[in-house]
């Protein structure tokens, strides 16, 4: 499992985890696992708890699509070690994971589409290549030619993941995934969900919103808290400020600027001794200071060894993915991916998790000067208006998924735009 995790830095340079961190998490999972008298049962409970615990700890660090990739890699390693007969051969697994250059195959004879107008020529070429590398599908071209109508219906089926493969019995989900890669790549995500659900459990498919309280609970004074800013991500500063107030902590926000490095370093050193929180914003903008940032983190570790580090201190930072971010800070820190949601419901829930909607007072109708305050509860119209604005924002965000069809001029419509709109609506209502 650790090697699956360590391979994720090929996907994103910010996905780095140390073996020291992994061992600590692993031991916590073993202690939390259900007890059993039989050794076989105890091992099964430990394996299940380790998988679940590790996934819960690392999932906040991954973008949503990378989280799916990580879960699939966990499935592959699980089946490889279990020796499952339903899993793929090395050749089949290589075919699944490899991008195929079809230009090299164009000159080969016998790859012509046998008069199937609904099947693209590239898809047919991939099917022939699959038949050459898979024992399960070694007669695939012949079976398609003998069952043209059934394969035509299968190809156009809207629920192709649940539909049996024509001419085959008992095809595993993994083999079906290879087949869908050839003819219906749009169904790969759906069948990946089915495989994850059946192999390691549906809990590995849940996309939880970023929860500061949970991540904070995993930390101590020597643990950097890193907000990784995804494309079109919102600024987490206001959310962190609200959380710091809730924890009754003084949050010092620093912006890394050239010429003010010494001021930043002194502020962090002072906060480490008095127990304040420090947020260093946009670390990716000052590459030349990153080596000093790593040295500063080592100073914090030295303070901890000498028992001079305040237990309430926390070092927070925001950064876009960058190869020069200090490796030691990444490996020892808790990473939290800040990304825009991909579904309407998630977009709305994300909005309710940010300011000013987190503030209960915001939901009371704004009162203009000289106007008598309304009793609490008589704010239905105001609440509906605010909710409608949130839904409008979610619609505008998701229209961007349709590229030029959605918006002629692309714009991210981030959470900051919604926040300013909500505050403006509040202001206009007061002055109306």
Feature map (PLM): residue ranges:
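Amphipathic alpha-helical coiled-coil
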Residues: 1-432
């Amino acid at each position: 499992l650790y090697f699956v995790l360590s391979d994720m830095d090929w996907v994103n340079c910010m996905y780095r985890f140390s073996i020291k961190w992994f061992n600590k998490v692993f031991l916590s999972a073993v202690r939390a696992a259900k007890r059993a008298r039989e050794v076989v049962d105890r091992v099964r409970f430990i394996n299940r708890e380790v998988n679940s615990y590790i996934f819960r700890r690392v999932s906040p660090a991954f973008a949503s699509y990378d989280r799916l990739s990580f879960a699939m890699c966990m499935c592959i390693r699980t089946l490889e070690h279990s020796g499952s007969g339903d899993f793929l051969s090395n050749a089949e697994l290589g075919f699944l994971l490899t991008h195929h250059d079809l230009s090299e195959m164009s000159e080969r004879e016998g790859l012509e589409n046998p008069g199937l107008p609904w099947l693209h020529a590239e898809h047919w070429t991939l099917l022939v290549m699959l038949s050459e590398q898979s024992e399960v599908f070694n007669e695939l071209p012949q079976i398609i030619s003998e069952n043209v109508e059934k394969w035509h219906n299968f190809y156009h089926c809207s629920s192709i993941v649940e539909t049996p493969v024509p001419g085959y019995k008992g095809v595993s989900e993994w083999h079906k995934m290879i087949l869908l890669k050839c003819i219906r790549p749009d169904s790969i995500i759906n069948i990946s969900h089915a495989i994850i659900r059946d192999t390691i459990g549906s809990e590995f498919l849940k996309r939880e919103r970023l929860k500061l309280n949970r991540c904070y609970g995993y930390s101590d004074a020597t643990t950097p808290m890193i907000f990784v800013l995804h494309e079109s991500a919102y600024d987490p500063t206001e959310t962190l400020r609200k959380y710091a107030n809730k924890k009754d902590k003084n949050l010092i926000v620093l912006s890394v600027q050239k010429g003010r490095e010494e001021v930043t370093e002194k502020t962090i050193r002072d906060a480490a001794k008095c127990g304040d929180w420090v947020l260093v914003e946009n670390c990716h903008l000052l590459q030349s200071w990153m080596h000093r940032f790593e040295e500063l983190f080592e100073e914090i570790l030295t303070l901890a060894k000498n028992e001079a580090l305040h237990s309430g201190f926390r070092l927070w930072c925001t950064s876009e993915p960058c190869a020069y971010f200090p490796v030691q800070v990444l490996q020892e820190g808790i990473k939290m991916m800040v990304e825009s949601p991909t579904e309407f419901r998630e977009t709305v829930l994300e909005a309710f998790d940010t300011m000013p909607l987190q503030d209960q007072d915001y939901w009371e109708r704004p009162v203009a000067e000289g106007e008598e305050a309304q009793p609490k509860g008589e704010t239905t119209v105001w609440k509906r208006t605010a909710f409608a604005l949130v839904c409008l924002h979610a619609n505008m965000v998701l229209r961007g998924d349709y590229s030029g069809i959605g918006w002629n001029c692309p714009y991210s419509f981030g959470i900051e735009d919604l926040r300013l709109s909500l505050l403006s609506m509040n202001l206009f209502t007061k002055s109306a």
